[in-house]
Amino acid sequence: MQDLGLARLIHAHAPDFALHASTQMTIHTLDAAKQARDIGFSRVVLSRECSREEIKLITEQAGVETEVFVHGALCMCYSGQCYLSAVIGQRSGNRGLCAQPCRLPYSGGYPLSLKDLMLAGHVAELSDWGVSSLKIEGRMKRPEYAAIVTKVYSDLLREHRRPTAEERDILRRVFSRDGFTDGYYTGKLGDSMFGTKTDVPMNEVKKLYDEAAHRFAEGKEAPLVPVSLCFTARKDTGAVLSADGVSVVMPVEQAQNRPTTPEMIEKSLRKTGGTPFYIENMRIEVQDGLMIPASVMNGMRRDALDLLLAKRGVAPSRDWLHGSVLPRDDETAAREGFRGYTATVRTKAQADALRELGLETVYVPLEVAAQTGLPAILPRVFSDNEQPQIEMLLGEAMSRGTDTVLAGNIGHIPLAKRLGFTVHGDFGLNAYNSKTLSALAEMGVSRQTLSFEARLAQIRDMRGPLETDLIVYGRLPLMIFENCAIRRQHGGKCSCQNGVTYLTDRRRERFPLLNEFGCRNTLLNSRPLCLREDFARLGVQTARLQFTIESPEECVRIARAFLSGAPLDGEFTNGLYKRGVE
């Protein structure tokens, strides 16, 4: 799951209920994985962008199970931070309904379409490190696709080996986009990771699908449950067959002629046909000179497996703490009324221009905070390798007077708290409801920017123990990605300092591309959001003006219009506040 509020609710009332943190939580650092563990998650699904070294580090040191994507579609954007489908088509990727607009053509071809992921050659080492689960992306794929790909990876995992040429070809034929990539895993980013769907001759695909369907129809693909057996036989205690927590006991006799051997016992016990079980491990200890008829051993096996079957049919019990399922104590905290406006900027010049307008808070990029001492925006994405640089900049910012950071990932919160900063939560934490506000407050957040995927009616209903901020102006950030699309738009040359780069879609809408920390990119909406409402009625304490490509003079003009209530000229959008998402 992604929703922190729902996770908090479940963990509070059913603490032994297993919670898995979705890839939509954008967990890609050790701090983020540990924070998820501390919230109550037992497993984290890591971002697809994690490198080999990052996966190994988190798996070995986070103290929580890890799940890793090994095959299937690769999103250009970090999962959980993509709002493109929601903003342009009302189908939210954060709710599992992405319409995949990144696969469409833009200026320069298909600059947002990556090849499918394939880590078939790395399964053995993932297993060796202790990765708990391998994840195969199968959304919007046929059942036969899921069966074929899963069989290949299951064989590789069970046999602890690399794929054969034939297996690689099977994966290619069943679906690919100009081949596959392991670029994030191996750290080889760039043009080789991009591709569009490859058309494979239909007869080749049909043959694979037919074979998969035939295996299923014959029952060859029926899922079997592994069982460990322990059989002991002694004259004084009899024969005891134990199978994963159940036991069957029968008397034994002294052999008159031919005693029963361990080989004879194993032959009888391995006959599991017609059951959902297969024998994974077996240990046999039998005293010499005993006779156990085959009919007795067969009966013991049947009885033990019947007991196991009955045991599997009983739903596991979970401790559910008494009390209301939906406690409302965290939704009744009194909050101040609307106080005024905040702003985020990208440059020192923008911040300087806004300094005298009396805004509640002006947040600046961390690099600018290190020069000015203003509240700092942490990069939404940075790796464990980059964290020392982040900590150095935070130290410089604190020495100049910065005491507050804007955090867009759960991993930022413990880092900022360790260093003594007040933490304000950014939109990247995807706060949709009152329960999430309460969860974030418990984590140490004192002000939270609400999700811009929420409707105004939902925002009015939100209550919680912390202040809330609402983005009301600016080009909304639609994607953030690890691969540099700016470089690709300029023929492979680094062009981040040469003004704003745009992607143009089929409708001739122009989407600005901006460089981010670590040579990452953010894709902005083609039109700025402009919401003019009675913010006091919405229940928020502050409203944010999010400045990106505006000049300092434009920042001042727009801020003054909001402060005075004057009209603004231009082409704007209300975003999703009135339309909502599916």
Descriptions of predicted regions:
Residues 1-5, 13, 17-20, 34-427, ...:
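Surface-exposed amphipathic alpha-helical tracts and adjacent flexible/coil segments at the periphery
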Residues 9:
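Phosphate-binding/switch loop-helix module in NTP-utilizing enzymes
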